[in-house]
């Protein structure tokens, strides 16, 4: 198995159902990844160590998902120069809005690229990581272009079906 280029990390194993969507997106592009659990609050030393050592494992992008206080992506970004993508996880309160705000509101100098809340966000995090890696990989860039074409073709098909259904 090849070294992981992307690290998917989550604050709790209860986030796995959502973060699997990032893994599926990466698998669709043939990108190797690792997946783990670490907590910004319950295991801060482990989280900092994980972030510091990611590049030495061959990781080039980190995707971090967390709910509630959702400081995981920010703590990781504070301990690495690798790009960090934050996925806000919906929590029992505020439907994930709290997670979104905690993930997106980073101080200047510690960027976290934040995507949408939940499964759509996790999918987009995987695709965004692929786009970052595609900047230095022509074969991956081609796969990304093909992905966009597939999406566009799907819309075209839906448009045709709708026009037929409506008789226009």
Task: Annotate the PLM regions.
Residues 2-42:
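Glycine-rich phosphate/diphosphate-binding loop of Rossmann-like nucleotide-binding domains
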Residues 15-19, 43-47, 66-75, 94-97, ...:
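Short glycine/serine/threonine-rich phosphate/pyrophosphate-binding segments
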Residues 22-27, 52, 79-81, 130-131:
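Short, solvent-exposed amphipathic alpha-helical segments in soluble enzyme
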